[in-house]
A protein has these predicted regions:
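Short, contiguous, pocket-lining structural segments
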Residues: 4, 26-29, 51
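A ubiquitous structural signal for well-ordered alpha-helices
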Residues: 8, 15, 30-33, 95
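Charged catalytic carboxylate motif
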Residues: 11, 26-29, 122
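Glycine-rich phosphate-binding loops that contact phosphosugars or nucleotide phosphates
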Residues: 42-123
Length: 123
């Protein structure tokens, strides 16, 4: 009988192999887009609502990191006021416009949107 640990690692490995096969072209396009931003002295903004904002937080540069990353963090679309309030805000059409204006996302910048479901008005 295999152990749960073996089952876990086998599952993770099979998912990584599938990701490499299925998402390679998209990942390569993302790399090229980020490289273009670096070469044009732009910034990489990352935005997510609800729990997806954690990904944006993780991109914030640290010592030795890529200092062109800018997480877009706003209380209205995070879960800090509770999941119900966050859900209402992230489903409000137009809520992101003023947020992006405040951050000054420009033509040479890249905006990465993180979404668990892809169904909300925000972003």
């Amino acid at each position: 009988m295999t152990s749960l640990v073996d089952d876990y690692f086998d599952d993770v490995i099979s998912r990584l192999v599938a990701l490499k096969r299925d998402a390679r072209a998209g990942i390569e396009r993302a790399i090229e887009a980020i490289l273009g931003v670096v070469q044009s002295d732009g910034r990489v903004f990352v935005f997510g609502t609800g729990h997806s904002h954690v990904i944006a937080e993780e991109t914030h540069y640290r010592a030795g990191g890529l200092a062109i990353t800018v997480p877009i963090l706003t209380g209205a679309t995070r879960v800090k006021d509770g999941a119900v309030a966050g859900t209402v805000y992230e489903r409000t059409p137009g809520i992101v416009g003023p947020i992006l204006e405040r951050y000054g996302v420009g033509r040479t910048d890249l905006l990465i949107i993180v979404s668990n479901s892809g169904v909300n008005a925000a972003p």
